[in-house]
Design a protein with these regions (language model features):
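SAM-dependent transferase fold signal centered on methyltransferase-like domains
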Residues: 1-254
Length: 254
């Protein structure tokens, strides 16, 4: 039996809508994505194999939402939203079901194939980036994200963008992927968010000196770099730039 036939037949025997269900199972085994009680959003969820797996893993206390332009046949324990994942109206429907802060966002989307590899790769990266941007709008701090993309020259840039927002990112190729497939999965763990926003005016204590001579302040565990400030000072600052891991601020008390 071929590799393809094994997972196809296995999915039929075990009641999954697609062989892709086993890809999510492996991603979950390796990166611990799905837990009892978690909220999960699947982008591009039709026909629903990943929804079935997610529903099994989060159980009755969890929430699973599938989003797709196509109608998704009912899956036990799953709510579905028909719409474009990039539309704010669609995101609002997701939030109404899953809450404002989702634990996990996954996407197994693939573009309509042209047979021209460079085109298919570019379209795949575009879809993955749209899924990533949607995930940033709905994920909770500490949340996880997994997305399919075709290997190629643009993957590294996409991965770097994702790495900027999460504690770490792994590249995985599940056993259930076809031997001829170029698909890989980027699995990002631990969404990072800043406790401050641009324009905030706050009082901070300078606790260290950075390599460039700037003062270093901490807001919770978040680092702010403050020029013209010395260790031991308590100063009022305005936040001027915010990144996931650190930010910059200017003194307002001089």
């Amino acid at each position: 039996m071929s590799h393809k036939d094994h997972y196809y037949n296995k999915s039929k025997q075990e009641g999954y809508r697609s062989r892709a269900a086993y890809k999510l199972k492996q991603l979950d085994r390796e990166e611990n994505l799905l837990h009892e009680g978690k909220s999960v959003v699947d982008l591009g969820a039709a026909p629903g194999g990943w929804l079935q797996v997610a529903s099994e893993e989060v159980g009755e206390t969890g929430t699973v939402v599938g989003v797709d332009l196509q109608r998704i046949k009912d899956v036990d324990g799953v709510e579905t939203v028909r719409g474009d994942m990039t539309d704010e109206a669609t995101k609002e429907k997701v939030r109404a079901i899953a809450g404002d802060a989702v634990d996990v966002v996954v996407s197994d989307m693939a573009p309509n194939m042209t047979g021209e590899y460079s085109v298919d790769h570019a379209r795949s990266v575009h879809l993955a980036r749209q899924a990533f941007e949607t995930a940033l709008d709905v994920l909770d701090t500490g949340g996880d994200f997994a997305v399919k993309v075709f290997e190629g020259q643009d993957v590294d840039d996409l991965r770097e963008e994702i790495e900027d927002e999460f504690q770490y990112v792994r590249t995985l190729r599940p056993d259930a992927s076809r031997d001829s497939s170029s698909e890989i999965y980027l699995v990002a763990k631990g969404r990072m968010t800043a406790p401050v926003a641009e324009g905030d005016v706050i009082e901070v204590e300078i606790v260290d000196e950075g390599s460039e001579g700037d003062g270093v302040a901490k807001v919770e565990t978040y680092t702010l770099f403050v020029p013209d400030a010395s260790e031991g000072e308590t100063v009022e600052v305005e936040v001027t730039e915010v990144k996931p891991r650190f930010g910059f601020a200017e003194r307002t008390d001089e």
